[in-house]
């Protein structure tokens, strides 16, 4: 399944709808859409990456509000994490895990400094992997994380995928879903990326009703 960051642009929304793409929503969007629910099926990101990019602390209050508003209808929810936090990030995520699971399936963000053994015992039908981290690390370890998720029957999602080449790498790693911003910004990118994601075995588990 393909996700793109939420947008209010009608042309892009309709292009996503026709192609069967979904939306990835996060706390910074709470005020932007004046309480309007997402127009397409969606998952929830915790917003930690956006806060990191803006140089501000993680918005715990905003994430909690997002959970209450949309959590029960989300495909899955990324558990709060600490960008570039390594194992400290995992400890932070574990403090939130039960709360997130009370709303929807949860994905634990894995990043530089983490190994499969750190999360393997947590994974299962309702707890999966959200592959973040630095670009080099993500590309280097993607297959390993895919194998770990597969061994536990867990969902495997890859973050920040905006090119056809990256989609092919997700296919090879056995990812069930990915997200990106390319389609959100430019609807003209959707046909090329959607054609690529329909090739091969990408998301076969989800499409078979896993």
What are the residue ranges of the model-derived segments?
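Alpha-helix-loop-beta-strand connector modules within alpha/beta enzyme cores
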Residues: 41, 94-107, 140-163, 202-209
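His/Asp/Glu-enriched short active-site or ligand-binding loop at hydrolase and phosphoryl-transfer sites
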Residues: 126-139, 162, 179-182
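Distinct, well-ordered alpha-helical segments
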Residues: 88-95, 115-124, 141-145
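Glycine-enriched alpha-helix->loop->beta-strand junction motifs that scaffold or abut catalytic
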Residues: 18-22, 38-40, 72-74, 101-104, ...
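Conserved, mostly hydrophobic/aromatic
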Residues: 45, 108, 170
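Glycine-rich phosphate-binding active-site loops on the catalytic face of alpha/beta enzymes
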Residues: 29, 49, 133-135, 169-202
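Non-catalytic, usually N-terminal nucleic-acid engagement modules in DNA/RNA processing proteins
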Residues: 1-95, 192, 202-209
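Catalytic cores of alpha/beta
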Residues: 57-61, 116-122, 155-156, 162-180
